[in-house]
Amino acid sequence: MNIKRTIITMFTIVTTILQAAGTLSPVNSGLKPAEIVSHDVVVTINNGFAQTEVSQQFKNINDTTMEAIYSFPVPQSASLADCQVQIGEQTMNGEVVAKDKAKQVYEEEKNAGNNAGVADKNGYQDFSFKIANLAPQDTATITFTYYQPLPVDTGVCRYQYPLEEGNTDDAGAMGFWERNDKPTGKATVRVILRSAWPVTAVRAPQGTVASEQADLANGTADITYELTEGLTKDFVFYYSLANNLPGRLEVVPFKRNGEDGTFMMVLTPGIDLKPITNGADYVFVLDKSGSMCGGKIQTLAKGVAKTIQKMNANDRFRIITFNHNAEDITGGYIPATSENIQKAVAMLDGVTANGSTNLYDGLKTALMKLDDDRVTSLVIVTDGVTNTGEVNPKAFAKMMSRNDIRVFGFLMGNSCNWPLMRTICDVSGGFYDAVSNDDDIIGKIMLAKSKITSEAMHDVKVSINGVKTYDVTKDCVKKLYRGQQLVMFGRYKDHGDATVTMKTRISGDDKTYTCKMTFPEQDEDNPELERMFAIAQIEMHEDMVNQGLEDQAENTDFVRGIGLKYQIVTDETSLIMLTDEQHAKHNIERNNQKRVQAERTAQAQRKTQPVKNYRVDAPRPTSPMPANSPAPQHSNGMFQYHAPHISHGGGAMDVWTVVIIAAMGAVAARYRKE
C-alpha cells in the first residue's frame, strides 16, 4: 500500500541587520529621536491568553517641538486594544476609528499645534505610535495594552515580547529613519503567571531576575526581569506544565446578561498517537540569499547537521539550497550513514549567502522526487519574505493543495509574513510556530520531529449541539499533531447544556469523541475574549482571501467593521489618542472607554480570586491538581490518556528531548554572543 505522508517543516528566519523596537526620527530632519527614559512591561498569563501592558516614557531632547514616533513588531495574533498618553497634567485616551478618519483628525490637531496621538498597524510588520507636538524637554508616557491567545505545545507554553525588528522593510525605508533603542533608565518585564495547572519550571533566557515570588505547584509566579541589553533583544518566557496532566477540554466564556456570548475553546487531546517507526525521508531546503549573511547560514547549517546526525539508520536525506533559484547539492536522497553525513556537513560549510529570495521555487523544488511509499519531511529554512519569482499567496495555496503534504512552519524573527505562512499551513494541514532570533532553532527542529514521528489526527471536525453557536474558527482542521492544542473562538446564543463532538481519523480508523458542557447565562470574568475573537475572525477571512475564496474589497469592509465593533487596531482601523474635550469636538463615541473600564474591572477582580479552572470534560477541581495526580478515567476515549509532554512519550522522543533541553541553553547563549 502506498503511504503518502509528506511533511514540510519550514523555518522562516529573518536575521539580517537586526534593528530594535524604539523611537524614530527622519535621518535628514536635523532632530534626534526622542530619548527613552524608561520601558516597563507587565505580562499577565491567565487561562490560555496573555495580557501585555507596555508603559514607556519619552523625552524630547531637541531644542524644538517634535513629533515623537515609536514602533515595535506586531506580535502573533495580537489585538491592540488600548493606548493612553500622559504629557504633564494632560491625559489622552484612545478610541478606535476608521484609519482615514484617524489620520484626518490627527493631522488637524497636529497642524493646530495641539498634542494628539495615533496608533496604526502596518500589515504584518509593525505597530507604530505617533505623538504630535512634544515640546522641548517635555516627557510623554505612553501606555498600551494588547491581548493574544497562548496555547501550550507538548506541555510547554511560550510567551514572546517582540523587540527585534525583522528587517523586512526595504533598504530605503531603513535608511530613512534614525533609531533609538537604548533607555537611559531601566527596562523591565514583569511576568505574572496564573495557571490552573501545576507548573514545574519557568525560564527567561534574556532577562536578569530582579525579584521573584513563585508557588509553581499551585501554578502561580510573579517575576520581574531587567532587560540589560535595552530594546535590542526579544524577551522570551517559557513555563512547563506538570507531567501526567490529563487530556482535557477547557471552555472560557464571556456573556453579559441578555446578549450573545463569546467563548474560547481549548482542546488538549489525550489520545494515544503512536510513533511512526518506518524509515523516513528528509529534505532540507536552505535559503542562501543575501539576507542569510552575518554567520546565520553557518549557524543554521550546524543545526541541520545536528539533526542529520540524530537520524535512524533506515532514514534518508536530501539538501537543497536556494536564493533566486534552487540547487540540489546532494544530488537526490542519500542514506543517513556516517560517511554521507560527513560529506553533507562539508557541503554545508561551503554555502555562502548572496542574492534574492524565491520561496516559491524553493517549495516547488522540494515537492519533486517524493517517494509515496515513505514518510517525507521537508525542512525549509528561509528569511520569510519572498521577493523574487511568484509572490501571490493564491499561487502558493494552489501549489500546496495539489500535494498530500504537511507543512511545519516556524517563522524566526519578527515582522514575518504570518498571513502567507498561515495560508500554506491551512491548505496543506500543516503546523506553524514562532521562533525568535533569541530563541532555540535546534530545539524547535527537534520538537517538530516529535510531531513528525507520531501519528496525526486527520480531518478533525468539531461540532456543538444543544446551544446555537456561530462564527466559530478552527472547527475544521485537516490535521492535529502530537502535543498540539486546538484553539477555537466563537459566539453563542442563549445558554444551557451542550454536547461537543469531535470526529477524526487516526491510522485510517474513524473516531468520534463527545463531551457535555454548559454555556452560562452570564459570566463577565473575561471580557478580553471579545477582542481576541475579533482577531481570530480577521485571520480566518484573510486566509480565505489568500486562497481565493473571498474578494479583497469585501474583506476590507469586514475588517473595518469588526475592528470598529470590537475596538481593535487593524489594517483598516486606528487608535486616535485625544483629550476628552478633543474627542467631543470631533464627535468620537467613547466605545473603547467603556470596554477598557469593563476589562480593568474584571482584571482587578481576578487578581483577588483563586485561579479558575475552566475544564468542562470532568468535575472541575477547586484548586490545581498536584503534579503527581493520575489522569482521571473517563468513558470518553479522548481523555483516557495523559496529554503529551516534552518529558515523556513514545518512540524516539526521549532522545530528542535530551537534544532539545541541551540546545535551548547553548543556542540562546550563542545568539546573545553574536
Stretch-by-stretch model annotation:
Residues 382-428, 433, 440-446, 503-505, ...:
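VWA/integrin I-like adhesion module and closely mimicked acidic/polar interface patches used
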Residues 170, 269, 277-334, 340-375, 411-417, ...:
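Von Willebrand factor
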Residues 654-673:
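A cross-kingdom C-terminal cell-surface attachment/processing module
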Residues 82-88, 93-118, 130-134, 139-285, ...:
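An acidic, Ser/Thr-enriched
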Residues 418, 423-468, 475, 482:
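C-terminal helix of von Willebrand factor
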Residues 4-6, 18-47:
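N-terminal, polar/Ser/Thr-rich
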Residues 320-347, 364, 368, 387-394, ...:
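Short beta-strand-loop
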